């Protein structure tokens, strides 16, 4: 069984400006943010069966409402051309970032899911490609990917 665990860092916006609304309903933003030492852990495991998401926080949905589910499904659709949810993966969330607190926990979890699946599925997508996919989920997703990628390159 192959698995990858990644820290999923919270962030705080020091300055946030909404520049306009895009055709997809999301906003164009200008922001200055700071990553925090507070993080969730996202573990993605390859195993047989349907997509399963588990979470130690009972108030977090573990179905298609979860941004992690949406990230896995979007990557699957984008690279494999399939509209069905991906199979043969389990995603476990260990939450430390308070939900709905404006700290970007869900976006960061989605970003780490994209990074982990890129490795596990051996897609070899570069960060720019992953960022474009992540941007379809929300403006904070690519920022989380970029920050974590920078941290990993320092290790």
Role assignments for model-derived ranges:
Residues 143:
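Short conserved loop adjoining the S-adenosyl-L-methionine
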Residues 69-70, 111, 132:
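A broad detector of short, well-ordered amphipathic alpha-helices
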Residues 146-155:
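Single conserved hydrophobic/aromatic residue that forms the stacking wall/gate
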Residues 126-137:
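Short, well-structured alpha-helical segments that form the helix of a local strand-helix-strand
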Residues 1-101, 119, 123, 127-128:
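ATP-binding N-lobe of GHMP and related small-molecule kinases
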